[in-house]
Amino acid sequence: MYYRDFIITSIEAERILAMKFDEAFAGVKNNAIDTLNQMGNGITRASYYTSCLMNNYQDVCSKLKQEDTRFIAGLAQLVKNRDIIFQMIKIYIETYFQNKKEEKAQNILKKLVGAGVYLSSAVLTNRILIMAVATMICQTSRFNTVVYGRINRARSLVLKGSVTATAVVLNVYGLIQVAANSADNLKMHNSFYYNALYANHLEMMYFLIEPVITGVPYLNPMIISDDELAELLIKLMR
């Protein structure tokens, strides 16, 4: 009986050990794939710069240079002012309140409270409601998991995935390309929010919160109803 139990225990231990090795190798594999994809994006972006040598593609060249400059400007804001993540969420909510009169705040507040969202009844203006909702969104575990996960992943790909100066450049360029793609997608699907971020030099940082924003349906800020806005905010706060 003892030997049988010992054999079963040994087999189980080997199975667990094999699973741990599989997990470890899967992690290494995924990191390697992410790094290669990032460098691939960097190579793609670097190849776009050949357009600067052709007279017919100066508009492409100009767009690339502008994206690089605005990415660096956004990154500088992120380093100096960690509040920009909150600012981007606040700006997003503001776009939906731009055509809402002040008295609408209480109506929307009642709908949020009725859905189980805890907000102070002292909220009287759109501005205060926007600040309160933006704060609650930024405090949700899902939001922090997504945003900080993206920040850490970007930092890891640039630093840990780079063993040479060339790799550093390609990884940074890859990150800029990811940011540019996200900004372009936003411009195509939600021009109101894109323009608001652009005015604040933050559109190239949008990629950090993109999964949060695309996780809720897009609604036209010009015609959104109070019920639709309340439902949108509730989804973001959960």
Residue ranges and their predicted role:
Residues 79, 93, 97, 113-116, ...:
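Generic secondary-structure transition motif, activating predominantly at the C-termini of alpha-helices
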Residues 83, 87, 103-106, 119, ...:
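Generic alpha-helical secondary structure signal
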Residues 8, 29-68, 72, 151-217:
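Membrane-engaging insertion elements
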Residues 113-182:
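Membrane-inserting effector segments that mediate pore formation, membrane fusion
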Residues 1-111:
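Terminal export/targeting leaders at protein ends
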